[in-house]
Amino acid sequence: MTTSHASHPDRLLPADPGTRDIARRLLAHVEDLPIISPHGHLEASMFVKDEAFPDPTSLLISPDHYLTRMMHSAGVDLADLRVGGHEGKSAREAWRIFMSHWDLYAGTATGYWVEQEFEHVFGINAERLNVGTPEHADAIFDELTDILAKPDFRPRALAEQFNLEVLATTDDPLDDLADHKALADDPTFSPRVLPTFRPDAYTKMYNAGWAEKTTKLIDTAGDGKAGWEGYLQAMRNRRQYFINHGATSADHGLHDTDTTPLSHKDAQKILDKGLAGTATLAEMHAFEANTTYRFAEMSQEDGLVMTIHPGVYRNHSASAQKKFGADIGADIPFQMEFTNGLRPLLSDFGENKDLISDSSFNRWLRTVSLGSTQDADMAAASNLAANSKMARQNTRDILDAVSDGGVMLGRNGALVLGPVVGTLHIKFIAPLNKRVERVMYKTGLSEAAAAEQCALEDRLREEMAHALYQWNPGRDENYDLVINTGSMTYEQIVDLVVETYARKYPLHVRIIPNGKDQ
């Protein structure tokens, strides 16, 4: 019987007993749900070929730069770990090296992850990792080799066992996405494998091969246009191609947060210099900043979610990159400034209601600024500043709360529900039978299971409010307005909210009849 902490049901849960109890219930609520992975680096071809993994080293060590860079920092040659296709050492010898250096991973997230793999995927006691002799390493290597040869450990079978529902890959804009299509057309494979548009190779002039790749992009997808116009057209076309193959997002690994746009003339000038190999480093970064801005612009048009992760010096070791290739663990973060860098992008696109979404917790505990020094900044309904983007957003906020039950708190919550000027605290009570019906419809649960889920959500919400904000959301006297949403139409509820705010703060709101400015 295993005694490894990796098998303990409370691993990683809080030490405080009361908080741990809440965490246990939260975990029980979600741990068996399907996996929806919006970002990853697996290849779609893995599931098309569905081949057995060759050996433990090729699967678990050589491609994992979190593992290899730790050993490299202790003097292990990456070639001995078979990184970048090097085969100086056998897979078995590389495994022995890993096992003999296991002490390096004590207390690290990487070590914890490997222990979880051993315990919960392979069924091997993780404590056996602590014995690093060659004989012991060989025994585990042979066990894993036998396990990986089983049909249950091929990519498709693992995807089903892990309850993988959606997996987003990361793909070059010129990828033909044939493997994604093959999977989408295969009725025997239930997970959805979606491509993600990753244009970094065409935005970073300072990377090797940029000019050749960019020329090919324009020639292939630019609709016959040249230069900067061809570049933009090619990107639009390939984004649409990805969307047609199921893509929902575009992923951008940025050098920094600069999003300053360039004029067409300046962009063309830098593009020409980049293709000729004469652009300065400052011009290269300006070009990348401009493309980030343009991709945000495109996201407003085609709906691809834009994800960015800036502030990492990729492939910091030039010698390691030359010998082993890119992405082998030589990435180093550097200090970032977000406010000024993202300002051009957010100034032009940040008010778009579809650009930034919020969490389900925020949909319950609203931090909507219901009121300020400006006229109609409350903007909660169509008869208040009908053309205001804030009006539309606050209207959606109220609709969410009406549908799900919960609380809307003005002026960043005013967390203690105190008498802060300009706030309005509202509680919506969604009838339990309606909530249960909604859960049954969305999840397919039975009525009893749906009712249990609603009850659990209510308990967790109340406990979270107590733990985080020291207040009881169930006490109606804490609110300016309490509404049973089953007794009124949505329009009536919005009107009541607006009227209540107008009565409480008559100087803050100007009622605009029929939604027209006067």
From Swiss-Prot:
Q: Name one GO molecular function term.
A: glucuronate isomerase activity
Q: Which SUPFAM superfamilies match?
A: Metallo-dependent hydrolases
Catalytic reaction list: D-glucuronate = D-fructuronate; aldehydo-D-galacturonate = keto-D-tagaturonate
Pathway(s): Carbohydrate metabolism; pentose and glucuronate interconversion
- GO terms (BP aspect): D-galacturonate catabolic process; D-glucuronate catabolic process
This protein's UniProt keywords: Isomerase
> One Pfam family of this protein, by short name?
Cytidylate_kin2
Please state the Enzyme Commission number of this protein: 5.3.1.12
EC main class here is isomerase
Q: Which PANTHER family match?
A: URONATE ISOMERASE
The UniProt family comment states: Belongs to the metallo-dependent hydrolases superfamily. Uronate isomerase family.
**UniProt name for this protein:** Uronate isomerase
Name the species this protein comes from: Corynebacterium glutamicum (strain ATCC 13032 / DSM 20300 / JCM 1318 / BCRC 11384 / CCUG 27702 / LMG 3730 / NBRC 12168 / NCIMB 10025 / NRRL B-2784 / 534)
